[in-house]
Amino acid sequence: MTIKEIANSLGVSTATVSNVIHGHLEKMSPETAQMIRKKLEEYHYIPNMGARMLAKGDSEIVGVITNYPNREEKFALQDPFVSEMIAALENAIRANGYYTMLHAAQTAAEIHRISQTWNAVGLIVMGLQANQCRELMQVTRKPIVFVDCYFDQGERYNNVGLDDEGGMRQMTEHLLKLGHRNMLFVGDQPVLWGVDARRLRGHQQALEAAGLAWQETHYFCVSKDRKRRGEDYQRMLEYARRLGCTVCLFISDYYAVEAIDFLLDQGVRVPEDISITGFDDNILSRVIRPRLTTVHQNVTRKAQTALHALFDILDKTAKEPVSLVLPTRIIRGSSVKDLRLNRTMHTNLTE
C-alpha cells in the first residue's frame, strides 16, 4: 500500500502521513499520529531509506571499514575475531537507531575513496596502519573513530585499542609459572609491526623480568597462504623441537586453533608433546579440544566503546581526541602442560 492509499483510507493528506513516517510531529495531535502509526503497522509499510535521508537532511548510517593487517578481503571477514567485532558493532549501531554500511578494504586509496563517497554520519575504521590513519584524517571531514590503530606516544586521535603488550606479558608470565622457559613465538609477518609487534614486546618484557633473554631465532613465521600452512606447522614443530621449546605462543587464536587441528591429525598430542597458546578468546578457542589457553579481550565492549566515542563527537561532547586502552585477562584452557608437576592443566578458570 502506498502513502497516498493510506492517507485516503484515513481521510488525511499524504503530507500528514509523511510527517509521521519522518518523525515531524510538532503540529500534529497525538491521536492523529497514533492512528496513522497503527495503519502503517497494519500494512507493514516500510519507508524508503533514501527518502528518509532527504527528509531529515542527513543520513542514519554509520560506516564501518575494516582493514586489519595482512588480511586478504576474502579472508578478513572469515576471521572469527573480525566477524565477531563487526557483529558487535552492528548490534550496537542498530540499538542506537542507526544503520551499518560495511566495507572490507584492501588499500589505503580504497579507504580514502570510500570515506569521501559514503553518505555516513561518521566512520569506525578498524586495523589501519598509523600512517594510513593520519592520511585519512587529512582527506575526510567526517568524524572518525579508529579501532586497533597504533599511533606514536603523544599523538592525539580517537582510538579504541587493547593492552596487547600487557596481554602477552600476562600469558608469558603464566607460562613461566608453569615451568616453561624455552618458548617459540609464532606470527604471520616476516617483520612484526602494529599489534603483532606490541604483543611480541609484552612477551619480551616478561622474559626479561624473569632474567631470560629473548632471541630472534625464537620467532617462527607462518604463511598467509592457507594451502601452505600445513607444511608450515610441521616445520614449526620440528623447529621447536630442535630449539628445545616446550610451548608455541601464537599471535592469534585463528592460527593456534588451526595448528592444534593439524598437529592432532598428525598424531601429535597437545599439550603432552607440545603446548599451544593463542590470543583473542574467539569462538574457535572455546570449541577446539583441548580447549585453548588464550588471552581474552571483550569484543562487545570494544565495539560499544568505539560507537560511544563516535556519538560523543557527533554530539559535540568530546572536547578533545581520546585514546582508550581496554584490559585483557588469561583464559586457562587445557592446551598447556604444567611442567612443574609434569601434568596437564585441566581447568577453565580465569586469572
Residue ranges of each PLM-predicted region?
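N-terminal helix-turn-helix DNA-binding module of bacterial transcription factors
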Residues: 1-60, 343, 348-351
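Short beta-strand segments enriched in small/hydrophobic residues
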Residues: 18, 54-75, 174, 182-189
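Alpha-helical recognition/docking segments in bacterial nutrient-uptake
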Residues: 61-173, 236-243, 254
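Short beta-strand elements in bilobed, periplasmic/extracellular small-molecule ligand-binding domains
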Residues: 90-104, 200, 204-228
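Periplasmic-binding protein-like
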Residues: 117-126, 184-187, 219, 241-253, ...
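Hydrophobic alpha-helical segments within soluble ligand-binding/sensing domains
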Residues: 160-185, 201, 228-237, 297-315
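An alpha-beta-alpha
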Residues: 169-210, 322-335
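Flexible loop/turn connectors
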Residues: 233-351
